[in-house]
Amino acid sequence: MNKTIEADVVVMGSGVAGMGAAYKLANAGGLKIAVFEKYPAQGGAVSNCPMCFCSTPDTPEAQKSAYEVLARFSNYSANMELISKVVKYSSEFPELFLNQLKIEAPMVVERDPADYGNQRGYTMGHANGLDVGDIYFINGRGQGHGMALALLRLRFMLEKQGVDFYFSTPIKKIIRDEK
């Protein structure tokens, strides 16, 4: 069955990246947002069951140190503007996960920005990356799935804000209105 769905912005995927995009768009306001997921439930890297997240504090020293570590890690070949945004937005994670989504973090490892990059750690998107911030170990449920629980709660929050979710719905074609 073919169906046309109209939206201002379409997000493909309901994993960490897709949900992050939907969250930022919903909070910008004034947009009709549709999130499409080809699987019957939320997917993406969340199926790898992350039990922690990294957050670079929003201080000049921490932001600069994390940026420099990730720039060197990529041999300065990555999209440096994107790295800057990722590091900056990661400072919002504790507020979102702990306060808004009510995910518990029984242990937080606060890191000195001068030590960023000196040991392996769970960093943004890299399970064996270089640590570039504070590490929050989060409670899961059942066999784990701490981030899956966070993203499920985020989905419920976004649905209340009017974001539409379509599961088992791979996108077949995008029709752009050039208004």
What is each PLM-predicted segment?
Residues 32, 38-177:
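Conserved N-terminal/central alpha/beta ligand/cofactor-binding core
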Residues 1-6:
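A short, basic/flexible loop-to-alpha-helix module at the beginning of a structural domain
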Residues 7-35:
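N-terminal Rossmann-like FAD-binding beta1-loop-alpha1 element of flavoenzymes
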